Amino acid sequence: MSTTDHIDTSAPARDLRPAGIAGWAATVMLFTGVILISSTGAPEPNFDAPAADIERYLETQDPWALAVGGFLMAFGLVAWLWFVCGLAAAVRRPGARAEWLSTVVLVSGTAAVAVMLTGATQASAYRGGDGLDPQVAQFAFDLTSVTLANMWVALGSFGLATGWAILAGRGEPGSPGRPAWPAWLGWWALAVGAGYLVVRMAFPSYLWYIPHLLFWVWVLVVSTRMLRVRAATDSTAV
């Protein structure tokens, strides 16, 4: 006789499936958008590249790839918001000592979107074909890089709050309606959150790829568990 693993949540399990779909959609659309925007024209320069390299990169980007990539990234951010809202509800446990952590999860995830919606990551590229002054191009590119780095702070807070909420929730009495998240998901989130804060202090450094890739793999794992969860019952599967 075996039992089915469930997610620790005060919301009905079936309500987490849209959040799981949103997590997958956000990951696919954001990565596809970034790849489309950065893969055309001259190679994407480093954070500390000279102005001439940045100017050539912006001037050689394909306008269609830029438009489609920007569309995918915008809708990917919307899907991310749906995932964040679902996750904040999923880690909330009424009566837990750290019940407020779900609010930090929601606010931190929303702050990451707010930073990206400033448009700094795309505004300079839209004018690249019109010819940019090298200094203006460098300023726009640097603004994009700093915007990305500031997003790491919000994602770091998101990871720390989510990991803490998962681990704190496991210490509360369980029930058939609120089965537990696995502890390793909580520790994974804590490690990624701390990693984001470390690489922000080390900016500019390509070490940011490590927590960033681990973070999005974590998002896919959590999203998959949301999709697989079933409404908890007292019965067991034989």
Regions found by a protein language model. Name each.
Residues 2-238:
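Hydrophobic, aromatic-enriched alpha-helical segments typical of multi-pass transmembrane helices
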